[in-house]
């Protein structure tokens, strides 16, 4: 089992988080290639340390590469266009079945005793389901912003 995860910034070596991720990925890829049998490679939010456009291109290229390797690879990402390249696409159920009005009432009734983020987290479903076809990724960010009382002036521009 090989994992590339967390902030890997290495100031002693002069590496940014992104540079350190690439170094670690190369090490993982080489170790997996030398392993007999099938390896499990886990990439958590790979290429998050660079700009979103290049990060998405890198993750798509890595996905295509890993799909050809004798391994099982699991990538978590927020980048669009990656899932279409994967052999299988799973998503966190998230807030998909959440009743927004009910949660807004819970937050309003909490009188500040329970943080809104904690109430939202209590409704979060971290279960995975297999996404079908070109199903788009969940778009919960605006709803969360509204529940957490981001100013209306900002919300109207989202």
Q: Model-found features: residue ranges?
A:
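ATPase nucleotide-binding head domains, primarily ABC-like/P-loop NTPase cores
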Residues: 1-158
């Amino acid at each position: 089992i090989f994992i590339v995860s967390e902030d890997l910034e290495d100031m002693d070596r002069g590496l940014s988080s992104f540079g350190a991720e690439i170094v670690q990925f190369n090490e993982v890829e080489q170790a997996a290639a030398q392993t007999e049998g099938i390896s499990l490679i886990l990439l958590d939010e790979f290429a998050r340390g660079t700009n979103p456009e290049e990060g998405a291109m890198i993750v798509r290229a890595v996905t295509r590469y890993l799909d050809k390797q004798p391994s099982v690879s699991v990538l978590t990402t927020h980048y669009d266009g990656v899932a279409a390249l994967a052999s299988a696409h799973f998503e966190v159920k998230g807030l998909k079945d959440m009743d927004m009005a009910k949660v807004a009432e819970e937050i309003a009734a909490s009188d500040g005793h329970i943080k809104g983020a904690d109430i939202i987290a209590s409704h979060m479903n971290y279960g995975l389901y297999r996404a079908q076809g070109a199903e788009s990724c969940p778009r919960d960010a605006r709803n969360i912003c509204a529940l957490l009382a981001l100013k209306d002036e900002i919300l109207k521009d989202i």
